Amino acid sequence: MEIQNTKSTQILYTDISTKQTQSSSETQKSQNYQQIAAHIPLNVGKNPVLTTTLNDDQLLKLSEQVQHDSEIIARLTDKKMKDLSEMSHTLTPENTLDISSLSSNAVSLIISVAVLLSALRTAETKLGSQLSLIAFDATKSAAENIVRQGLAALSSSITGAVTQVGITGIGAKKTHSGISDQKGALRKNLATAQSLEKELAGSKLGLNKQIDTNITSPQTNSSTKFLGKNKLAPDNISLSTEHKTSLSSPDISLQDKIDTQRRTYELNTLSAQQKQNIGRATMETSAVAGNISTSGGRYASALEEEEQLISQASSKQAEEASQVSKEASQATNQLIQKLLNIIDNINQSRSSTASQIAGNIRA
């Protein structure tokens, strides 16, 4: 009975000493890991990246510190293995082996960084999608500007053509009217004047013949009976004023008509020439009017072309930004994969250590 109590007391002391050793070793190990983690330069921000700004002396000190800490960890691990070997004889179902303390706190840090990078990757993916939509909208706007530019050019061309054709038609009509009036003056007034001139010439010829006949014919009337021996010679006979007026009155009337017709012809010719000049001037100004009406369409087309260039520039910038965002997302994804590989390696090391410990315990 005393021997059994002695064994129980020894086992109790052994458990207490083992727990104290385990607690002290865990505290020392945690401090060592904290020191190691303090030397890891890790910046977590919008784009978390690992940055190292140490010089050669600091790197040498850090390597020495890491080597020293590794030796401490190795000694603590050996001591822990010995303690576990001693505790293996006193284990009960209520006092099972707990190896959770063998996991480093760096795993939690790496997991947090991986989660942050995953959120960053999601944000970058959304940003890339939004930039792609912006690029698509800019391209669509550029296409619409091209369509509007074509419509403006088409409408301005149609407007200019219609204006030019309309003004040219008006001028041509005016010119045709002047030519028609000139032809009418030639057919009517000038022809009438020429006909009257011929009639006047015939009348003068007949009058001259009549005068010659009256002068050269013998005087048989009663007025010559009283002349007697003092009869006048034929060349001394003169016509009375009434006789001359009666003979020349048809010629005067014809000459007036001729003068009237010629004046009318000249006036009609001038009017026709004026219409022709107006028509030609109108047709010459049709090109200018067409260019003026087309200039508005060209201005609208230039504005649409400017909007098109702006839309194309916006689309190009959005595409470049989207490409940069995609590249950043891919880089973040690669970094996440590296962190996941590190976590996987840690888990495998932990499983291997646990298996080794279990094998040693069974041994």
Curated annotation (Swiss-Prot):
It is found in: Secreted; Host membrane. It holds the Pfam family IpaC_SipC. GO terms for cellular component: extracellular region; host cell membrane; membrane. It is a single-pass membrane protein. Its main location: secreted. Keywords: Host membrane, Membrane, Plasmid, Secreted, Transmembrane, Transmembrane helix, Virulence. The chain crosses the membrane at residues 99-120. It comes from the Bacteria. The core secretion machinery of the T3SS is composed of approximately 20 different proteins, including cytoplasmic components, a base, an export apparatus and a needle. This subunit is involved in the formation of a pore, called the translocon, in host membrane. Component of the type III secretion system (T3SS), also called injectisome, which is used to inject bacterial effector proteins into eukaryotic host cells. IpaB/SctE and IpaC/SctB are inserted into the host membrane where they form a pore and allow the translocation of effector proteins into the cytosol of target cells. NCBIfam families: IpaC_SipC, T3SS_SctB_pilot. Belongs to the SctB/SipC family. This is Type 3 secretion system translocon protein SctB. It comes from Shigella dysenteriae.
